[in-house]
Amino acid sequence: EICACLVGSEMCIRDSTYISWRWLGTESADTRYNIYRSLTEMSSYGQKINNEPLNATNFTDLFIASDDTQYFIVPVVNGEEQWDKVGAVQLWDNNYMDIPIQKPENNKVNGEEYSYTPGDASVGDLDGDGEYEIVLKWDPSNAKDAAQAGFTGECILDAYKLDGTRLWRINMGPNIRAGAHDTQFMVYDYDCDGKAEVACRTADGTIAGDGSVIGDANKNYAVVSNGKNLTGPLYLTAVSYTHLRAHETCADL
């Protein structure tokens, strides 16, 4: 199902409304779009505001919309409007969207306390509802470059819906050091089932979204002198929303 997500931010100058939406990978290259504006919530689809079907994924409506204005972005395929793939969107209150996130609790490693700050993020439709979710990496305050010695706190990945609902949390565990060179992740629909997976490197002790543990939960391979895992196995894991238990885990990398 297609919807116009991340759409409808009223411009600061308030003399127009800028609308943007996604062109999905499942849509053909010749897909066009019509935009309808409805001035009353829950009313009809209103009036079409573009003259010809658009071959872009953004549009500026020279109209000062009210809070209850709704927009409908309708795909046009072979000259036919695809109304079965349409959802209504409303204006944001600001030029950005506030999404509440849940900061992990402070923790300690080797007796030293660390805290968390949000780091890298990526987007994908994790649950197949046509709306993006956000995958966010939490970096501990003692994160280190791969060349640096020292213990780090545990790296954490969260998945959030746009209203702030947390879908899952993955704790990378003690055998994945926290740092930009150690945890990268990819969000993509690898198996083409309409729901994106999250692929990343894991190790013994990584806790998946359902609380299950990958590998041996009791193993800690961190070298006392530098905090690095130089001998323990590493895995490539894909996690899906419907299989929070680590959808697929490859053998030792």
How would you describe each model-predicted region?
Residues 31-43:
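Extracellular low-complexity, O-glycosylation-prone stalks/linkers
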Residues 41-51, 166-167:
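Surface-exposed loop/edge segments in extracytoplasmic proteins
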Residues 1-8, 13, 243-246, 250-253:
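Single conserved hydrophobic/aromatic residue that forms the stacking wall/gate
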Residues 23, 28, 34, 54-245, ...:
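Beta-propeller-forming repeat regions
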Residues 17-19:
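Structural beta-strand segments of beta-rich domains
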